């Protein structure tokens, strides 16, 4: 992993806190932080403003999506929030409706705290042994659940993807936007930040795990 951090000044604790967080995240996924770039641009960045980018290089197995067939199952691994996607819309909802960030959101958790949840790292949910049983994997990022999942399938592959009930955070989105479930799935992860496609015979070893759920099948 390599990082790029640019700011007005590296003085103070902000830069060190960010670097520490990157290091901790890399350790969680057994990834080496091998270098990066830091730039001070006081004429461009004011106060604590900064830009942060990261780049990860990895080896992957040869794709197995050509083995996907009718009857294979689609399993979703639950997300822990919005996962950094759809935040332009969320900010608009907050600003247009003058919603206070410190209001209660889900249970006793404040809205600001929920929105700042780090994206789940799915490395810990799957082992290298699992890869032999998985035909397709999708990290659900920008573009929502449907578009990201479709990218991992052979062209013209048909499937059924069913989310019976959206997590509570999407009631907030629907209340202020009147978006339908289909429209929400074009922007957000709908409660599942990662999907895998497996043969029906191999599905039980995944479905018995915490946060894994059957959400569809290949047609």
PLM feature segments, named:
Residues 13-32, 44-50, 100-116, 120-219:
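Glycine-/charge-enriched secondary-structure boundary and capping motifs
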């Amino acid at each position: 992993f390599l990082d790029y951090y640019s700011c007005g000044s590296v003085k103070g604790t902000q830069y060190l806190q960010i670097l520490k967080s990157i290091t901790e995240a890399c350790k969680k996924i057994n990834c080496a932080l091998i270098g990066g770039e830091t730039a001070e641009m006081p004429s461009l960045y004011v106060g604590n403003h900064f830009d942060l980018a990261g780049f990860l290089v990895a080896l992957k197995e040869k794709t197995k999506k050509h083995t996907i067939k009718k009857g294979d199952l689609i399993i979703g691994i639950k997300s822990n929030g919005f996962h950094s996607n759809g935040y332009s819309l969320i900010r608009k909802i907050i600003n247009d409706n003058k919603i206070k960030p410190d209001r209660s959101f889900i249970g006793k958790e404040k809205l600001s705290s929920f929105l700042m949840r780090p994206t789940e790292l799915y490395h810990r949910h799957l082992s290298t042994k699992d890869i032999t049983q998985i035909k397709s994997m999708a990290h659900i990022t920008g573009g929502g659940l449907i578009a990201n999942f479709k990218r991992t399938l052979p062209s013209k592959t048909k499937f059924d993807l069913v989310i019976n009930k959206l997590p509570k955070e999407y009631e907030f989105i629907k209340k202020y936007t009147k978006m339908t479930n289909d429209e929400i799935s074009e922007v957000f992860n709908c409660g599942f930040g990662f999907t895998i496609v497996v043969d029906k015979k191999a599905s039980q070893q995944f479905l018995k795990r915490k946060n894994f759920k059957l959400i569809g099948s290949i047609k």
